[in-house]
């Protein structure tokens, strides 16, 4: 899937709306434009186009029980209790910087462990639009990894939510979910990042 807007074509998994009023409302995050229209016509960047496996099965069943949580300083860990009570099967967490989840005072790691132990798939990405997350860099990310969260590398949060909905439509097994998230299916992860 692609998004074509303002003479630019963006890979759908990399498209993010960055402006509310500007005609160039969308940007391609962590990937060049797939194509641009200029005075010479449509100029396609073949290197950006993801390979297509003709035997890849069409799977249109999506799990709607996915929640996106943007961390803010001091977020109450009981938010995870509420999400478990609602029957959420997947959580995408927009963490701090390269990968940080608070564990001092309001410790989220115990609640991450509880959610994962109860069968919830928890994937983590960065609130930063550009570059990749790496939860192994700092203690605030390492503790989250120890609980079993799944990294999204340089995926946008929009792509992470969509991918989690798609994967949970296929399987609830956490190891299978992690396997799918370490695979670049349609250009959502830059080559060589994971």
Predicted regions and their residues:
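Accessory alpha-helical/coil subdomains and C-terminal extensions
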Residues: 2-4, 11-93, 97-98, 103-104, ...
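C-terminal non-catalytic interaction/assembly regions of soluble proteins
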Residues: 98-194
């Amino acid at each position: 899937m692609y998004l074509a807007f303002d003479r630019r074509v963006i890979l759908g998994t990399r498209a993010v709306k960055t402006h509310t009023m500007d005609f160039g409302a969308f940007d391609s995050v962590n990937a060049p434009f797939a194509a641009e229209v200029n005075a010479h016509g449509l100029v396609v960047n073949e290197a950006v186009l993801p390979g297509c496996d003709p035997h890849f099965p069409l799977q249109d069943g999506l799990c709607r029980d996915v929640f996106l949580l943007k961390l803010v300083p001091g977020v109450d860990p009981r938010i995870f209790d509420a999400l478990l009570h609602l029957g959420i099967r997947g959580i995408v967490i927009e963490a701090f910087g390269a990968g940080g989840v608070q564990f001092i005072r309001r410790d989220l790691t115990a609640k991450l462990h509880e959610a994962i132990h109860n069968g919830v798939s928890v994937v983590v990405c960065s609130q930063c639009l550009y570059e990749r997350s790496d939860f192994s860099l700092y203690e605030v990310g390492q503790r989250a990894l120890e609980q079993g969260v799944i990294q999204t590398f340089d995926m946008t949060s929009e792509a992470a939510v969509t991918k989690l909905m798609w994967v949970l439509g296929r399987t609830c097994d956490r190891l299978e979910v992690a396997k799918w998230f370490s695979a670049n299916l349609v250009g959502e992860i830059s080559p060589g990042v994971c």
